[in-house]
Every structure is written in C-alpha cells, then in structure tokens.
C-alpha cells in the first residue's frame, strides 16, 4: 500500500482497493482493473517503460503469496511454538501432526521419517496396542540419552509414537473407533466376529502388521504373510456364520517377509514405513554410483557436481520464480532441495512430471543462510516403493 502511494500517487483509499484486490480470490481480474491507474501514476512520477512494467509485475506476483504484517506475526508465533514443541516433545509433536491429517506441506511419511531422524521411535499399527489415532506409549529401548545440542537425540528417552488403526488403508475414523473400543482381541477370528469388516479391510490390517500382537503355533509373533492368508478367510467367518464352517483360518507355514518387503507392505497399507525408508534399501547401489545422501551434502564444497536421489515429496513453481521449478527429494537421511531451470524442466519434462522418485546430477550451491540447493543438469527415474504421491503447488 505504501509503495502504491509513494511511486504511483495512489490515495489511501485507492491503495486500500489495491490491497483488497491482492487478497481477493479473483486477484488477477481485480488487479487488472487497477493496472492503468497504477501506470498513469508511475508515469506522473517519471517511472515509465521497462522499469514501470517491472514494478507492476513484482507487485502482481506478490499478490500470489503475500500477506499482511499482522498475519506474519501470527505465523511467526506458530513457527516458534511448533519449534519449541518439536525440540522438547518431538514424539507428541509428531503424533499431533499425524492426527491432524490431511493438512499442511508434509505427508505422514515425511513427518514420521523426520521424527525417526530426531530419535523418536515410531511403531506400526497393532490391533491390541493402537488406538483409533496415533498415540504415545512408553519406550524402554536401551541406548544413550538425549543431548540438546544434537537434534538426532531429541526423542531418546521419551515416549514412542504408535500409529493408529485409522491410518490403515480402507479403515476410516468410524471403524477405527469401533475397533479400538473393542480391544483386546483374542485372535483374528475374534475380531471378525465382533466387528463387521470386509475382506479388503481385514487384509489391509494384516498387511500393516496389525495382527503381530497375536501368536503363531510356536508362540512367536504371527508373521505378516500368514496373517494375510488368515485374514481373508476370517472376514468370511463373521457373526452370521456357524463356527467351523469357514476353512483357511489356519495358515500354512510361509516364509517371513524381509525388511524391504515389510517396508513395501507398510507403505501400501498405511503410507508410512517408519522402519525403512525406500532409499535405504538401494543405498549400496547408490553409493556405488557416487550418489550422496542429503546429510553428506553438508561436507561437499560449493560449486561441486553432485548426484542425489530420493522420493519426490513436493513440486513447486511460484509465479515469482520466472519459470524455475523447485523439487524436494527425500532419502533416508533427510531432504534435498533441487532447482530446475526452464531448459532443464523442458528437456526432462516427462520424467519430472511422472516419476515418483528421481536420481539427479547437478551443481551444489551453498546459500548465505546455510541452505543447500542442487541446480539440476540431468535427471533419471529411480525405481522405489512410494507410499503417497508428491504434494505439488504453484
């Protein structure tokens, strides 16, 4: 508003009209109505040609993301409060964000991976231990304690996060409440008798590892593959069936899932793999190709050519960026900012728009505020299991 008054001769009332136009959902149309008045005011003050156009374009672009100072104060307060909670109570902070989904910039997978990197133990759903939503539970795992100076230890010695049954694909909040209220359950068949679940819902719970609280014939935790086998049959053995008429409840001995297979199962069933980020299982191959982790980039000098790889979490092309596109890649150690020029985006458009994970070669840039960016030169798809689509913004 002050700039419109100073450089374009707007009155206070006209400047307020400009403010309202910038805040409007129909911003482009309302801004266009004020454009000629703005240029006339600029010309009266000797500002013409390319300079006048540049001033207007910057102002119009600001309308896409700008907000008043009072809003920025509120935002700063939220940022401070969030930072305080994450520092002092990282497990509770993570659980609260998971329970507020869908929301915000980061997916549940990114939120849980960040919590794990800060020393928080995140546990998969468990039919008898989980509530409907994410909860906190005592963690008794041994190890060194918390060091305030080391963010990777902030969650040590504190509670663990237990994912809720509501996080399982196809369950939903109402059914999750019913399941949680009915705890404990004796076995898979007991659940099927007491809660009306479809075959797909039973199999989703089994795939998520929620039946690990039950035991196999040898007393060990029920393996996921055997749980999936039994879940389909159990879904047919509901309260309206006579006991013993449904076959298949007792699964044969099946090979157990390895860590990679459990990670894929977690991502498919809940979108969250707390014990295994997808790139973790490719690290030996990535290392052999000279691909750096997000953490390792901190020790690479400015201007060096680097290779990075990860799951695409975000794509952004702000109106103020002159066509430049920004992507975030996530590996098992953190996030990498990748910048794509118009030329690079055009050359690799098909891959950049469709691939869920990427391997990127580019130049590393160290900004003055400590942020690292990789300016991309070459891009190729990376084949990994991905739990959710990227969150894309303009």
Where are the model-predicted features located?
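Noncatalytic, beta-rich nucleic-acid-contacting surfaces in large DNA/RNA-processing enzymes
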Residues: 1-394
């Amino acid at each position: 508003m002050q700039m419109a008054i100073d450089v374009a001769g707007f009155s206070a009332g006209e400047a307020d009209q400009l403010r309202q136009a910038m805040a409007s959902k129909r911003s482009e149309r309302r801004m266009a109505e004020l454009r000629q008045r703005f240029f006339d005011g600029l010309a009266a003050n000797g500002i013409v040609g390319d300079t006048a156009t540049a001033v207007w374009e910057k102002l119009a672009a600001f309308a896409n993301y700008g907000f008043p100072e009072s809003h920025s104060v509120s935002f700063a307060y939220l940022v401070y409060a969030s930072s305080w909670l994450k520092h002092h109570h990282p497990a509770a902070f993570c659980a609260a964000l998971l329970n507020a989904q869908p929301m915000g910039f980061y997916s549940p997978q990114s939120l849980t991976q960040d919590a794990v990197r800060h020393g928080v133990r995140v546990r998969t759903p468990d039919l008898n231990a989980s509530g409907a939503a994410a909860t906190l539970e005592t963690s008794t795992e041994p190890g060194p304690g918390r060091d305030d100076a080391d963010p990777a230890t902030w969650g040590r010695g504190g509670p663990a996060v237990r994912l809720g049954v509501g996080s399982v694909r196809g369950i939903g909040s109402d059914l999750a409440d019913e399941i949680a209220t009915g705890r404990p359950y004796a076995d898979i068949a007991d659940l099927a008798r007491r809660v009306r679940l479809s075959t797909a819902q039973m199999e989703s719970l089994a795939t998520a590892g929620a039946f690990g609280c039950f035991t196999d014939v040898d007393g060990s935790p029920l393996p996921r593959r055997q749980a999936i086998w039994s879940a389909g049959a159990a879904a047919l053995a509901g309260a309206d069936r006579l006991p013993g008429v449904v076959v298949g409840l007792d699964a044969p001995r099946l090979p157990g899932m390895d860590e990679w297979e459990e990670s894929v199962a977690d991502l498919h069933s809940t979108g969250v793999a707390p014990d295994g980020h997808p790139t973790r299982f490719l690290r030996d191959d990535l290392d052999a190709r000279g691909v750096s982790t997000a953490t390792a980039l901190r020790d690479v000098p400015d201007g060096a050519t680097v290779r990075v790889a990860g799951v695409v979490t975000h794509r952004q092309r702000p109106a103020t960026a002159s066509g430049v596109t920004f992507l975030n890649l996530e590996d098992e150690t953190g996030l990498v900012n990748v910048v794509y020029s118009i030329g690079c985006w055009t050359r690799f458009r098909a891959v950049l728009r469709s691939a869920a994970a990427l391997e990127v070669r580019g130049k590393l840039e160290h900004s003055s505020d400590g942020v690292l960016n990789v300016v991309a030169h070459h891009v190729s798809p990376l084949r990994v299991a991905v739990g959710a689509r990227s969150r894309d913004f303009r």
